[in-house]
Design a protein with these regions (language model features):
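Conserved alpha/beta-domain cores
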Residues: 1-170
């Protein structure tokens, strides 16, 4: 997890100094990193979005605290904006951008994540068939339209519904 460019540069240098060969990337788990993803992408080989922590920091919540746990919904439009910001920056830099965890395992949400440019999704094996089928069913333009519709929503429920409607109407 990095918060800014200095963190990312320190991490890349530390990895190289100990002889790490191969790709070096950073986790985007704080809003500041997502908003500055273009600068971070210039110094790393990939970006990976940790949506659970990103949501926690974006909404100043704890998923274990009942009254505010609802803000941890991965369909929060502001969270989708942060993921899209990161994916677009990675794409512009020519590097991959991944999303891991339960967020990536939702077939409809996977389409919304891939829409703006997420290039890899990490999830439990049991979720792969449904996510694979959803991604194969919908065109790139449909995924982009679903992402735009979800991000324009005013609530997680509306984001989910508009994404589903957009994908089903392709």
């Amino acid at each position: 997890m990095v918060a800014d460019l200095d963190d990312a540069q320190w991490f890349v240098t530390a990895c190289r100094d100990v002889g790490l060969v191969g790709s070096v990337g950073v986790m985007i788990e704080v809003p500041a990193a997502a908003l500055r993803a273009a600068a971070l992408a210039a110094d790393v080989d990939f970006l990976s979005v940790g949506t659970n922590d990103l949501a926690q920091y974006a909404f100043a919540t704890d998923r274990a605290v009942g009254p505010v746990a609802r803000l941890q919904d991965p369909w929060q439009p502001a969270l989708l904006d942060l993921v899209a910001c990161t994916a677009v920056a990675a794409g512009a830099a020519g590097i991959p951008c991944g999303v891991c965890g339960k967020t990536a395992a939702d077939p409809t949400l996977a389409c919304v994540l891939v829409g703006p440019g997420v290039t890899s999704l990490s999830m439990g094996a049991g979720s792969l068939p449904a996510v694979r089928a959803a991604l194969a069913t919908h065109t790139g333009s449909a995924r982009r339209a679903a992402a735009a519709a979800a991000r324009a929503a005013t609530s997680p429920a509306e984001a989910r519904a508009t994404a589903r409607d957009t994908l089903s109407g392709q």
